[in-house]
Amino acid sequence: MLLGRMGMTTEAPIFVRIFKEESELEVWKARADGHFYHFKTYPICNWSGELGPKVVQGDKQAPEGFYTVSKGMMNPNSGFHLAFNLGYPNIYDRAHRRTGDFLMVHGKCRSAGCYAMTDALIEEIYGLAREAFAGGQESFQVHAFPFRMSA
């Protein structure tokens, strides 16, 4: 199994990064040393809007920022196959009067403000999160960027 070859376990904590411009979602997993290492990069099937943050409910803009996903935000019965809620708006978004809700990473490859994956890919990503929660992780971070930052 890929995890074992990379020195990672199924139940190890995860961390997620999203890059809009590149249409990529990365999953990072913790190793025994407590540090996170890149596990896999997944192509995002679809996201809506443009580069830049979500501002108002209905703008069909996928959010950018730092979000925390807890076990209760996982939806195995989503109308979009499987989904997890990003937790938008976060404290920063609310302080800037940004509105909206139910912004997700989900399957079905359709987006009106979410990050949509293929069903096969959301199954893998959702499974990694589910196993991390089963292993004791209480929440995981999702950092959504407009593009990769470089010098």
Label the model's feature ranges:
Residues 14, 22-26, 32-36:
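Primarily extracytoplasmic ectodomains and periplasmic/lumenal surface modules that are beta-strand-rich
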Residues 1-15, 27-29, 46-57, 64-71, ...:
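N-terminal post-signal-peptidase region of extra-cytosolic proteins
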Residues 58-151:
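Exported/periplasmic cell-wall-interacting domains
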Residues 19-21, 43-49, 142-148:
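Acidic helix-start/capping segments at beta-turn-to-alpha-helix junctions
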Residues 31-47:
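Short Gly/aromatic-enriched secondary-structure transition segments
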Residues 12, 19-23, 63, 80:
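Short, basic and Ser/Thr-rich N-terminal targeting/leader segments
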Residues 8, 17-21, 76:
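A short catalytic or substrate-binding loop motif that flags glycine-/basic-rich loops and adjacent residues
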